[in-house]
């Protein structure tokens, strides 16, 4: 199944890659690769991950303190957030309304 980023989720992902890259380029690459691998797993078996609210599911990265929040749309997976666990857990909820 294909996937798309919500624009704000794409920004979060890019900002996080930049943050880790500034600390260490290899760390930025590792973060990027890990998130891409998690998204790949989501696209292969989207219903396996925990539902956290309504139709929103979450898959947690292993090495970094992030969760990938997504919904299963008709023809694709919509990535709603690339969420660092230190953030307010509800900051992304307005993104559901914009896309439903």
Please tell me what each predicted stretch does.
Residues 9, 35, 70:
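GIY-YIG nuclease signature motif recognition
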Residues 1-32:
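Arg/Lys-rich, positively charged N-terminal/basic patches that mediate binding to nucleic acids
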Residues 8, 64, 84-87:
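Residues that form or immediately flank small-molecule/cofactor binding pockets and catalytic motifs
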Residues 44-77, 82:
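Basic/aromatic recognition patch in beta-strand/loop cores that engages polyanionic ligands
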Residues 7, 39-44:
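Outer-membrane beta-barrel domain signature
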């Amino acid at each position: 199944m294909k996937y798309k980023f919500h624009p704000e989720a794409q920004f979060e992902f890019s900002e996080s890659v930049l943050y880790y890259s500034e600390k260490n380029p290899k760390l930025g690459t590792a973060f990027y690769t890990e998130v891409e691998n998690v998204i790949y797993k989501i696209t292969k078996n989207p219903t396996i991950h925990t539902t956290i609210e309504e139709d929103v599911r979450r898959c947690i990265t292993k090495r970094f303190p992030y969760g990938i929040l997504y919904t299963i749309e008709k023809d694709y997976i919509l990535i709603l957030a690339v969420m660092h666990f230190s953030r307010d857990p509800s900051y992304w909820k307005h993104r559901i309304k914009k896309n439903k």
